[in-house]
Structures are given as structure tokens and as C-alpha cells.
């Protein structure tokens, strides 16, 4: 079942078709020191963002159950496996900071982890990093360029934030290369995937 929650016109799902690679394969010489630091930070992104603002918000774009695609599959989450997809935007003081997409295998949503299927506007990271069993097994990075759906989303959000004008005017906002990261976590020995893309006004680019 598809559930779209965010209260402005964004088509769900956004999806993320990135060129994911391990940090060791990324040429960091072209990236700023702050961006590299945010990309490689092993702590809670939610907690770090909260330290930079007075008002932290999660706005849910949508949620739906679907088969895992080949592009997002891994050793622990197989192609075709039923997953709950959740897409959100993280805001700091009304500035869109991060687009996040999580894949939660339905098989992982058992026991205490059932709470992950009913987060609402509660940040996923807050739940994950409060659990001492959490392990990050893999971290991958990817740039996102002009033909990416997340860059198109960023242009709309930037237009809305900059002038509160109708989103149809978003085409006048210059697009930029964005960077994101994707992590495979184990929570109570149950796998899940979280991808986070830093939006144009993110602290990571400052």
C-alpha cells in the first residue's frame, strides 16, 4: 500500500539511482573538508543536525511496501524481498537539509522492531542509534547530478524555501551536484538500509 504524507506536491517515491561506491574508491580531492566530514561521520546524523539548529523536523514524503529492486539489493536484502520504503526530508529551522530513503525488510519488522513501521514524523536515526545493538556493516557514497530525481527534488525545495513561490517556478533555480551516503545496518541482527542525500542548503556544503 502506498501512503503519501508530505503536504506539498512531490511525487512519491523519489528513488535514488546513484553511482554507489566505497569511500576508498572516491576521489575526495574535489570535495570540501566539511562535506567529507559529514559523509564519513559514523554517528547519528539526526543528533548532529539537532546540534546545529533550534527546530529540527521530519517531513514524511511517503511510505509503501514493495519488492526490493536490483539497484538497492545486497547480500542481506535480496532482490524481490518485500521491504517497507520510507522517504523523508529532514529540516533544520525550516531549511531542508537531507533527503533520506530507508528500506526496512518486512522480515526485520518483528519484535521490538515493529515500531519502525509506525514512526510517523519521528526520526529513524533517533531510534536506531538509541539501540546499543546497532552496527553499520557498509558505507557507500555517491554523487547526484542534474538528471537525478533527487536533484530535481532539491530544486523544488530550494525554490520553495527561497521565495515561498509556487513550485512551478522551480526551474529557475540553478541545480548543483549533490552528495549522499548509503549505509547497511544491523539492528538486533536484522538488516536495513538507509540512504541520505545532502540538499543544496545543507550544513555539509558550508
UniProtKB/Swiss-Prot annotation:
The keyword Lyase applies. One of its GO terms (molecular function) is chorismate lyase activity. Pfam families: Chor_lyase (PF04345). Its EC number is 4.1.3.40. Removes the pyruvyl group from chorismate, with concomitant aromatization of the ring, to provide 4-hydroxybenzoate (4HB) for the ubiquinone pathway. The keyword Transmembrane helix does not apply. InterPro entries: Chorismate--pyruvate_lyase, Chorismate_lyase_/UTRA_dom_sf. Its main location: cytoplasm. PANTHER family: CHORISMATE PYRUVATE-LYASE. It is found in: Cytoplasm. GO terms for cellular component: cytosol. It is an enzyme of class 4 (lyase). GO terms for biological process: pyruvate biosynthetic process; ubiquinone biosynthetic process. This is Probable chorismate pyruvate-lyase. It catalyses: chorismate = 4-hydroxybenzoate + pyruvate. Pathway: Cofactor biosynthesis; ubiquinone biosynthesis. Substrate binds at residues 86, 124, 196. Keywords: Cytoplasm, Lyase, Pyruvate, Ubiquinone biosynthesis. Belongs to the UbiC family.
Amino acid at each position: 500500500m502506498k501512503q503519501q504524507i508530505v503536504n506539498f506536491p512531490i511525487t512519491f517515491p523519489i528513488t535514488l539511482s546513484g553511482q554507489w561506491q566505497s569511500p576508498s574508491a572516491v576521489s575526495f580531492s574535489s570535495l570540501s573538508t566539511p562535506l567529507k566530514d559529514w559523509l564519513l561521520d559514523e554517528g547519528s546524523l539526526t543528533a548532529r543536525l539537532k546540534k546545529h539548529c533550534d527546530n529540527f523536523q521530519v517531513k514524511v514524503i511517503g511510505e509503501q511496501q514493495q519488492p526490493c529492486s536490483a539497484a538497492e539489493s545486497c547480500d542481506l536484502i535480496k532482490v524481490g524481498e518485500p521491504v517497507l520504503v520510507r522517504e523523508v526530508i529532514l529540516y533544520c529551522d525550516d531549511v531542508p537539509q537531507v533527503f533520506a530513503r530507508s528500506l526496512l525488510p518486512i522480515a526485520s519488522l518483528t519484535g521490538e522492531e515493529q515500531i519502525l513501521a509506525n514512526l510517523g514524523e519521528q526520526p529513524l536515526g533517533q531510534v536506531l542509534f538509541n539501540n546499543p545493538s546497532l552496527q553499520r556493516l557498509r558505507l557507500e557514497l555517491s554523487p547526484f547530478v542534474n538528471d537525478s530525481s533527487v536533484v530535481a527534488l532539491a530544486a523544488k525545495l530550494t525554490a520553495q524555501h527561497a521565495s515561498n513561490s509556487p513550485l512551478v517556478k522551480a526551474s529557475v533555480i540553478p541545480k548543483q551536484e549533490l552528495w549522499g551516503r548509503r549505509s547497511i545496518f544491523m539492528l538486533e541482527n536484522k538488516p536495513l538500509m538507509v540512504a541520505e542525500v545532502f540538499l543544496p542548503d545543507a550544513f555539509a556544503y558550508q
